[in-house]
Amino acid sequence: PGNNYFDSNLNYAKKPIYGISLGWEINPKVGIDGKITNSFGATPSTGLLTIPSDNLPLYSANITYRPYGNDTYLRPLNNRDKSISNGGITVNNALVPQAGVSQIKFNYDSGGNLFGYYGYSLSNIFQLELLNIGSFNDLNFGGSKNSKLHSTYLGESNFNYRFGGKLLLFSPQKDDLYWLTLRSSVGRNDDTNQGYLFSEFINTFRVNNWLAFNVSPKYFFSGVESFGGIGFSSYINLFDNLMLIPEINTSIKNNSDLNSTLALRYSFSPEKSLDLYYSNAAGVQDIGQLLKVKDYRLGIRFNFLL
């Protein structure tokens, strides 16, 4: 007996409560589970209620970490592959640093975009993105298309913070043909308090000892707009410590954007490098990779594996 739902006019009713969950033990060290439910809470009393004033599904994800569990064995990366494991500028790659390694990036460009990133590998095949923060600044989109999207996530006082993970599925380090990784992140713009989900399915191929390339389908999901995209990039070794990185991204939607980036990476060591780049992407953080601005910008990024 009783009601478990009310609408915006405080009309009470009964609604069925549902829940669907999926768990995956990736290896003895790391497990992931996700859940979709319209239940308001996890306690016996709140679990019978829908969320206030609505009956919408809620999404959750949990990570189980066992520090002393056995990890998936991967052969160590050689120095050339280790130098590309810091990824590109606007197109990521599928490599994951080995367990226990911290990945740090700092980025700034001539338009005032500023971003910082910290990731930690819980396993040889799973990296947790603990900190991905920054702001887009002085973006000129040259028109009003996608104006609501821009004002919601890239407005004048935006500050975006994000959290996510990167899961390695295939790797030549365990005799697969190429690297394949699933990466997802969630977060919001602190100024508008609006968030989005960003996912990508990253494929990295090592062609020979001086060339590797990436193909990365991407998807942006939000309450304002949702659309897909795809990124292409390559790593061209000019010398042992100097690399050219050309990149292209395009969104798949009405009024699609096509942006390009050209970067030059100097490696002080396989773990430390400096990127100089020229790009008309809105920025290096998630949504910025799929949007184009009117003017090209010069940027710099510092990369560390510790």
Regions found by a protein language model. Give the residues of each.
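Outer-membrane beta-barrel translocator/channel fold
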Residues: P1-R66, S135-L168, Q173-I202, R206, ...
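Active-site cofactor/substrate anionic-group-binding motifs, chiefly glycine-
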Residues: E129-L131
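Outer-membrane beta-barrel initiation region
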Residues: T43, P52, P57, R66-S121
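Short catalytic-loop micro-motif centered on adjacent basic/acidic residues
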Residues: I104, I245-I248
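Short loop/turn motifs that connect adjacent beta-strands in outer-membrane beta-barrel proteins
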Residues: I26-I32, N70-N78, A94-A99, I125, ...
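Primarily extracytoplasmic ectodomains and periplasmic/lumenal surface modules that are beta-strand-rich
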Residues: N124-Q127, N137
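Primarily recognizes Gram-negative and organellar outer-membrane beta-barrels
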Residues: N9-Y12, K82-I84, N93, I245
